[in-house]
Regions:
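A conserved regulatory-domain signal marking ACT and ACT-like small-molecule sensing domains
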Residues: 1-146
């Protein structure tokens, strides 16, 4: 299973750095991030890190509001139109996602597309059934390389 850590952050100077300081101290590497503004000066930071369980624990212990959520990471080709091809397959599979972001792994070769879906087991199966490759947590976290 692959997880992201989501942190509810106030949009204030230095708040993101507080997160990165906690992770740096624990030698947790950020593999991918997505920060978006919500409302009234708040945002949600989604992180894929080398040790999500420890990051979740340490961030909460530091007084932050962090959640651990399972995600699906799909391999895509890093080329013009690569995302479009992937999205066509995701639509063909009948999978809807509520949040998404990408990360280039090998420039011009591979990228990861991180998606947040409602029914992880069912949606994973649907994606595999249309020929998409689900990336293992060891590859996502950088424990192994492609």
């Amino acid at each position: 299973m692959t997880y992201q850590v989501s942190i509810f952050l106030e949009n204030k100077l230095g708040h993101l750095e507080k997160v990165t300081a906690v992770l740096k101290k624990a030698e947790i590497n950020i593999r991918s991030l997505h920060l978006n503004h919500t409302a009234n000066g708040w945002g949600i930071l989604n992180l894929v890190v080398s040790n999500p369980e420890l990051a979740h624990k340490l961030l909460n212990e530091s007084g932050m509001s962090a959640a651990l959520r399972e995600i699906v990471v799909v391999k895509m080709t890093d080329k013009p139109g690569g995302l479009d091809e992937l999205l066509k397959d995701i639509v063909k599979a009948g999978v809807n996602f509520t949040n998404a972001y990408g990360r280039v792994v090998n420039e011009g070769v591979n990228a990861f597309f991180v998606i947040d879906v409602q029914d992880i087991p069912d949606d994973r199966l649907k994606l595999v059934n249309v020929g998409l490759e689900i990336i293992s947590d060891h590859l996502v976290y950088g424990i192994q390389s492609l």
